[in-house]
Amino acid sequence: MNDLTTPEAINLERRIFLKASAVAGGGLLIGFHLPLTNRAGEAQAAAAEFVPNAWIRIDADDTVTLRVASSEMGQGVYTAIPMLLAEELECDWARIQVEMAPANKAYTNPLIGQQLTGGSTAVRAYWLPLRQAGATARDLLVRAAAQTWKVREDECRAEKGVVIHKKSRRRLRYGQLAARAATTTLA
């Protein structure tokens, strides 16, 4: 019977472990590097998207992507936070996709002072910043529609992912306004 606790067996196992770790680590490095090589595709995609702030991206297909700075650990963050945004942005909650926010000071939890999840603070901490982000995006979309139609902004309203001109009933989807809204600023 082979005893796996002898010094020779332990050294052999250590060598195998180190070799396997080096191969796996190299594979991870390659895996994370390859997506960065397609800059031309990213530039094309960016032309048709609207990124009004660090939290929100609206694509030409009407998809709203929300970056969430708190991990989902059963407390409902990936449900509650998108609902806050949907309400303020005036869009269908089902159209919001959630992605984890990257490490960045913009996503610091204001109650904790760091970008981390804890203390059941996600909704309390991000309630106001996300409502403000949604309102800003909505206002920029309304302004972009008003500029497109050459009408006053107060003649337009956002509702269920579209901007509607009240008098003429013309409608533009958020995705249709994304490129123009990306070049629009608030007064």
Label every PLM stretch briefly.
Residues I56-D59, N104-T117:
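Flexible hinge/switch segments at interdomain interfaces of large molecular machines
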Residues W55-R57, E88, T148, E153-E155:
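Short, surface-exposed charged micro-motifs
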Residues N38-A80, L84:
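Conserved beta-alpha junction segments in alpha/beta enzyme cores
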Residues P110-W149, V163, K167-L186:
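Glycine-rich and small/hydrophobic secondary-structure elements
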Residues M1-L12:
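N-terminal secretory signal peptides
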Residues V64-E99, R124-T148:
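Alpha-helical support elements that line or immediately flank enzyme active sites
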Residues I10, I16-T37:
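N-terminal export signals
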Residues N38-A40, W93-A103, E153-G161:
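Beta-strand segments within the central parallel beta-sheet cores of soluble alpha/beta enzyme folds
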